[in-house]
């Protein structure tokens, strides 16, 4: 089940509400990534406390470990991981195509060697839909080929991007057919591909629109292309997506990317950046980024961001976070992750409020000025 209510707009920016089988998601929203069924360093309780409405799980990795038998014994991913709110699962396609020489692509699907134990495995649109049905995720993604930005060290040609996109379209129909055959009560999103070529993106969207997906994602961005190319494609595709369906930008990105995405008409985002950067001591704040390992923070008694209400900023100094990072304490990674995810989710809250009050352009200007100011 999916119901999307478009509450209001401000330019191309959209304030919406997505109702799914496990709850309501206020949009625009950021989805923390829980690759193996866990958002790294965070408990479900902590995710609730910082305002996460929905998290992302990885079909490919959960299929390999712990395996579908284990998840099925818990009647799905929600009970297995102790999370009672919505979950989106990707199709596994991106991970398979990231294996490079370890995989072989045909019209049927992808044959590859398991990165866990080397076993020969096969993943197809049908198998991806079956796995995601067992996981019982609220939002299922079609199986697609993520068109690479580079092939053999050069930009993908129009012909290469077209071939890849058209196979993804054929796989989209097979995904839709299998989703319906399984009588899956959840939602299925199609993925717009086409590389850096606007005409191919238009062709992809036209083909997907005929299949009547519950929502639409923009794939194949943030895969190594220059930022200006990413923004060019994003600003071309997002306003053309069906207005009455949710819009999801996959795997993006920085705080600046989220604001630009919302301005273009995107409702949903996911990225490992806030969690991965947190573990590496790279912290996002309203006034720019903090690299906590730097010696400048050794004796700094201030919080990361005095305007931030997260547990980390309310209780600990930059000096303590610097110390934890330098000595490799696990608590450092946890406190950093709490802060970064809180910052991302607070940013989304502020954008929702700005759109509601039709002052998104003012918000965007202030956001850019604050981030450019830098931390003192």
From Swiss-Prot:
> What UniProt keywords are attached to this protein's entry?
Glycosyltransferase, Metal-binding, Queuosine biosynthesis, Transferase, tRNA processing, Zinc
Q: What is its EC number?
A: 2.4.2.29
According to UniProt, this protein's pathway is:
tRNA modification; tRNA-queuosine biosynthesis
In alphabetical order, the GO MF annotations are:
metal ion binding; tRNA-guanosine(34) queuine transglycosylase activity
For the protein in the UniProt heading, the enzyme class is transferase
- The organism named in the record is Cupriavidus necator (strain ATCC 17699 / DSM 428 / KCTC 22496 / NCIMB 10442 / H16 / Stanier 337) (Ralstonia eutropha)
* Protein encoded by which gene: tgt
Which domain of life does this protein belong to? Bacteria
InterPro entries annotated for this entry?
ArchSynthase1/Queuine_TRR, TGT, TGT-like_sf, tRNA_ribo_trans-like
Taxonomic lineage per UniProt?
Bacteria, Pseudomonadati, Pseudomonadota, Betaproteobacteria, Burkholderiales
What protein does this entry describe? Queuine tRNA-ribosyltransferase
């Amino acid at each position: 089940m999916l119901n999307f209510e478009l509450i209001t707009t401000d330019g191309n920016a959209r304030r919406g509400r997505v109702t799914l089988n496990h709850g309501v998601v206020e949009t625009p929203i950021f989805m923390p990534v829980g690759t193996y069924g866990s958002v790294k360093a965070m408990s479900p309780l902590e995710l609730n406390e910082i305002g996460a409405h929905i998290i992302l799980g990885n079909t490919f990795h959960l299929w390999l470990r712990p395996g579908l038998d284990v998840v099925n014994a818990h009647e799905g991913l929600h009970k297995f991981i102790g999370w009672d709110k919505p979950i989106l699962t990707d199709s596994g396609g991106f991970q398979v195509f990231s294996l490079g020489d370890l995989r072989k692509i045909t019209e049927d699907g992808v044959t590859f060697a398991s990165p866990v134990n080397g076993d020969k495995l096969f993943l197809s649109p049908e198998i991806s839909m079956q796995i995601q049905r067992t996981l019982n995720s609220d939002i299922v993604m079609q199986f697609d080929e993520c068109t690479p930005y580079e092939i053999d060290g050069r930009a993908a040609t129009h012909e290469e991007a077209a071939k890849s996109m058209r196979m993804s379209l054929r796989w989209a129909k097979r995904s839709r057919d299998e989703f319906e055959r399984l009588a899956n009560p959840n939602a299925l999103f199609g993925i717009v591909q086409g590389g850096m070529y606007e005409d191919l993106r238009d062709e992809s969207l036209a083909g997907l629109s005929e299949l009547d997906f519950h929502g639409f994602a923009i794939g194949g961005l943030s895969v190594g292309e220059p930022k200006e190319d990413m923004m060019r494609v994003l600003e071309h595709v997002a306003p053309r997506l069906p207005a009455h369906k949710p819009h999801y930008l996959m795997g993006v990105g920085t705080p600046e990317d989220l604001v630009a995405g919302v301005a273009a008409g995107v409702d949903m985002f996911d990225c490992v950046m806030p969690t991965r950067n947190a573990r590496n001591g790279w912290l996002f704040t309203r006034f720019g980024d903090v690299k906590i390992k730097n010696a400048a923070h050794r004796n700094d008694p201030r919080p990361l961001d005095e305007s931030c209400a997260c547990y980390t900023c309310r209780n600990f100094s930059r000096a303590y976070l610097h110390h934890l990072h330098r000595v490799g304490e696990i608590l450092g990674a946890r406190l950093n992750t709490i802060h970064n995810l809180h910052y991302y989710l607070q940013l989304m809250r502020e954008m929702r409020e700005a759109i509601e009050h039709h002052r998104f352009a003012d918000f965007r200007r202030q956001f850019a000025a604050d981030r450019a100011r830098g931390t003192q």
